[in-house]
Amino acid sequence: LRRKPGMDRSDLFNVNAGIVRNLVEQIAVTCPKACIGIITNPVNTTVAIAAEVLKKAGVYDKNKLFGVTTLDIIRSNTFVAELKGKQPQDINVPVIGGHSGVTILPLLSQVPGISFSEQEVADLTKRIQNAGTEVVEAKAGGGSATLSMGQVPG
């Protein structure tokens, strides 16, 4: 289920949690050694659901289950580059935490060669944390942030 205007990532939980659970149950049976990258929102909780399903099936490996939040890094690099008049590929903002609102934490103090005022840190952090909502509202619910998905045969 994709986000629509007025929804946040947690609104997707009821539908997406069931989808992730069903898919991971099948993975546990058909390809128990698979590396699993989860991008389904809310990533913070869908990864935990996947882990529990894999544990229940007796095939959980903490080194093979990933929550994909690279989008937050790309957005952070882009916003910092915009603000500082640089190219996004020349910026590297470490981002820790989850992929849901205030759990997204850009480590702006760790960006090499760039300093920020307290106001810039506050404004950038808020923009990065709310970027997903900004995209959904700009698209008026008319699409998904996902370019494509694929299934690799086991």
Swiss-Prot record:
Top EC category: oxidoreductase
GO MF entries: L-malate dehydrogenase (NAD+) activity
Binding site for NAD(+): 16, 39-41, 149
PROSITE patterns: MDH (PS00068)
SUPFAM superfamilies noted in UniProt: LDH C-terminal domain-like, NAD(P)-binding Rossmann-fold domains
Chain residues that bind substrate: 3, 9, 41, 75
EC number(s) from the headed UniProt entry: 1.1.1.37
Catalytic activity: (S)-malate + NAD(+) = oxaloacetate + NADH + H(+)
Catalytic center residues: 99
Cellular component GO terms held in the UniProt record: cytoplasm
Keywords: NAD, Oxidoreductase, Tricarboxylic acid cycle
Keyword Iron: no
Effect noted on mutating residue 142 to A: In strain: WPP9 and WPP10
Single biological process term from Gene Ontology: tricarboxylic acid cycle
Subunit composition and interactions: Homodimer.
Family, similarity comment: Belongs to the LDH/MDH superfamily. MDH type 1 family.
Function statement: Catalyzes the reversible oxidation of malate to oxaloacetate.
Name of protein: Malate dehydrogenase
Native organism: Pectobacterium carotovorum subsp. carotovorum
Lineage: Bacteria, Pseudomonadati, Pseudomonadota, Gammaproteobacteria, Enterobacterales
